[in-house]
Amino acid sequence: MAYIQKINVKYHDKEAGSICELPALYTEKGVVISQIRYLAWYSSKSESWKERSIFSLKLLLTYIDVVPNFENSTLLLKGFTKALLVGTIDYDKMDDELGLYWKARKPRDANNILFHITHYSDFLALQEGFDSSRINPFRKATSYEERLNWCAYYHKHANVFLNHLSNQNDAAFNAKRVRFIDRLLEPKINNEKAMKFPDEHFEKLLYIGMVKGSTPDYKSQAMTMLLNYGGLRKSELFHLYVSDITLHPIYRDEALVRVYHPEIGRSPDSSFANRREYLLESTFYKPRNTYRLSERLYAGWKSPLLTNKDGYFEVIFNPPEKAKEFLISWVNYLKYQRVEPAKTDTHPFAFTNSTGAPETIKNFQRIHKRAVKKIGLEVQKELGTTEHGHRHAYGYRARQLGLSQVEIQKAMHHKSSLSCLVYIQPTSEDIRSKMREIK
């Protein structure tokens, strides 16, 4: 009986002389080698991107394996796309002839899966020996590799999945062609309410929720201030070094916080080329965005807009005076509560746990959730009471201050001026209030 399992493998790149750990698919016929080479080629992609790629291909292989008597691969791939969108269950008969029992997916999710399969198919079509690898007709192909090469072939020559256009001439030519499967239409949804943490409860969260007995939890307070007053993404907290937080050279009672790229940012030790080299050669750690998604030390990196050649951006506190409050919590944390790393396990990360090891996202989420509940709020993304709600609050306040879109882009470290729109759009109530003011 066929089976497809996700495993982790170590891939040795002989040309680069490096070894990396990658997710892979293991079947009854062995490992899908082409997928490993594909992920190794795109090794700089995030762990979540790699996991999603593996997940998408696993779905395709699972579907290919259960479809009986596949004579036409184009129809097979078209059926796969339909199965993603509407599911495979016949609710009239309460049965599933394929035995997959897939439920319908949202168009956005289905499109994401098709994107990853398309991207992988494009990679296969460019490999040396691609033409000879399809020596067997699709219906007689026995290995997953052969079947995937045929999928790539049909995608390349018939635009089965997505239609990528390289220039205007290609666009004009392809506009005359009938595509078998176009990108699934997604309904346009404009979130009615910004998912921002309620401003009226934030002080309570800091000074009531984040208190152990009668002792303030300075670490949690400082981290949460960086989210709400500094507009940082949650993951960016866990790339900070102690040396990244200093006194502002001009405003001496305020903190200056710089967030460096976890790999190419300038090392705190000038004898190392960058932070990646510094961590690998002087500690037992590595840049936290390079850990596997399933590892507790993993922290993502969203590629924010860096503003200095040393590979960092500066936190812009909003309101500006909150840089003073943050500095107080940060200094108190360093003086009274930070557990220093063991001498045999040193590291530069700013926030540590009770043993001195680097703090983790999961533990911070647990602390934040407990604090929110302590002040009587429900923890829901839709209510803005998760960690990400603070960044929304930051962007919303920036708009209320009258900052321009470009200024908000700079403050929130977006590469595109359009990216900040999701954080600053007015609610229906905002518009009603504005209209009432107009007389």
Predicted features and spans:
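Basic/aromatic DNA-contact patch characteristic of tyrosine site-specific recombinases
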Residues: M1-K45, I250-D253
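Non-catalytic DNA-binding core/recognition domains of DNA-processing enzymes
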Residues: W41-R147, C151, I367-H368
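Alpha-helix N-cap/helix-start motif at helix boundaries, enriched for small hydrophobics
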Residues: S53, M223-T224, G231, S235-L240, ...
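Short, basic (Lys/Arg/His-rich) helix/loop patches that form interaction surfaces
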Residues: I64-V67, E340-P341, T346, G356-A357, ...
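Long, amphipathic, Lys/Arg-enriched alpha-helical "connector/arm" segment
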Residues: A152-P216, D269-F272, E295
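Basic, Lys/Arg- and aromatic-enriched nucleic-acid-binding interface segment
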Residues: K204-Y229, K234
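Conserved tyrosine-mediated DNA breakage-rejoining catalytic core shared by Y-recombinases
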Residues: L240-E325
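Catalytic-site neighborhood detector that most strongly recognizes the C-terminal catalytic loop/helix
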Residues: M412-E437
